[in-house]
UniProtKB/Swiss-Prot annotation:
Family: Belongs to the class I-like SAM-binding methyltransferase superfamily. Poxvirus/kinetoplastid 2'-O-MTase family.
Any single Pfam family the record assigns to this protein: PARP_regulatory
GO cellular component, one term: virion component
Binding site for S-adenosyl-L-methionine: 46, 74, 76, 80, 103, 105, 124, 147
Domain of life the protein comes from: Viruses
Name of this protein: Cap-specific mRNA (nucleoside-2'-O-)-methyltransferase
EC number(s) on file: 2.1.1.57
Keywords attached to this entry: Elongation factor, Methyltransferase, mRNA capping, mRNA processing, Protein biosynthesis, S-adenosyl-L-methionine, Transcription, Transferase, Virion
The keyword Methyltransferase is annotated on this UniProt entry: yes
Species, as recorded: Fowlpox virus (strain NVSL) (FPV)
UniProt catalytic activity: a 5'-end (N(7)-methyl 5'-triphosphoguanosine)-ribonucleoside in mRNA + S-adenosyl-L-methionine = a 5'-end (N(7)-methyl 5'-triphosphoguanosine)-(2'-O-methyl-ribonucleoside) in mRNA + S-adenosyl-L-homocysteine + H(+)
């Protein structure tokens, strides 16, 4: 059991957070009237991305998948201010990566002077993916990160999402990455258009996502198994909606009991669980997980100009 709580309480007893969608067992019918909070703090979006990408890249480090002949291809990377932290984190670990950042929007200026970072100012289509594949040396392994989103900059329609997922499938098929982190939010059942396919992967739940976000990251490693696609139908969409609404209304707003940390809110508990196992250079040693996570949180919040 992950947690034990009563409906009326605003506290949880948990030994670990829900990290992946398949761990969610509770369901809650969607209720638009409950979606009354859109409060976000400055830098929250970049924090969400940074924590998810730290987890993803650390998984590859521990699996000995990530090494110095690797190119990180990040499509939809702007503004990307969090990438500066990732870059210096990898540099501290002496992992000499190459980065290709691609977006038609403007990137944070702090990225322009970084060594081995190429910034390409354009949006991606199938034709450009073939060109990109030919640009990258054949002996370089590709790790793909995608954060593509609607050109309108608003909540995407189901048609927008289907277009994005078809494009992400092309990214995986053409670039042939050894691993990928893809943006993933199932279209809502009441806006359903048609069934579609996505790559198999672990559906990573994002700490510090907006309060009622149903977005996840689809994490896949292809070095041990070929790419497989799974079909998503309307029944799956109903399950996604109910379980993500349960997570966002019954779990994330609460505090975690017996969690010895300055902030006991669920998203901080989740962040703690990710950061406590992050690989660090050998010269950075801590006597407790709490010391380690406080150190990392301060570094991350300072990098993103977040006021705790």
């Amino acid at each position: 059991m992950h947690e034990g709580h009563q409906e009326s309480f605003k506290e949880l007893e948990m030994t670990k957070p829900y990290m992946f969608f398949n761990e969610l067992v509770g369901e809650e019918d969607y209720n638009k009237e409950l979606e009354n909070s859109n409060t976000k703090f400055q830098g929250q979006g970049q924090l969400k991305l940074l924590l998810g990408e730290l987890y993803f890249l650390n998984t590859l480090i521990k699996n000995k998948t990530l090494c110095s002949d690797t190119v990180i291809v990040y499509i939809g990377s702007a503004p990307g201010s969090h990438i500066n932290f990732l870059y210096h984190y990898m540099d501290d670990l002496k992992i000499d990566l190459k980065w290709i950042l691609i977006d038609g929007r403007d990137h944070d200026r702090s990225l322009e002077s970084l060594k081995n970072v190429s910034i390409i100012h354009r949006f991606v289509d199938e034709q450009y993916l073939f060109k990109l594949r030919n640009m990258i040396r054949k002996n370089h392994k590709i790790v793909l990160i995608s954060d593509i989103r609607s050109l309108r900059g608003k909540e995407p329609t189901s048609e927008d999402l289907l277009h994005d997922y078809a494009l992400q499938n092309q990214m995986v098929s053409i670039l042939k990455p050894i691993a990928s982190s893809l943006k993933w939010r199932c279209p809502f059942p009441d806006q359903w258009i048609r069934d579609f396919y996505i790559p198999c992967g672990d559906e990573f739940l994002q700490p510090f996502a907006p309060p009622f976000s149903a977005e996840m990251r689809l994490l896949s490693c292809y070095s041990r198994a070929p790419i497989r696609l799974i079909r998503i139908d309307k029944n799956a969409a109903i399950e996604y909606e109910k379980k993500m609404f349960y997570l966002n209304t019954k779990i994330r707003p609460k505090i975690v009991l017996d969690f010895d940390y300055p902030n006991q809110k669920y998203d901080y508990f989740y962040m703690f669980y990710i950061l406590k196992d992050i690989v660090l250079p050998t010269y950075k040693e801590f006597s407790t997980y709490k010391q380690k996570v406080i150190f990392l949180q301060e570094a991350i919040f300072n990098a993103l100009n977040i006021k705790p």
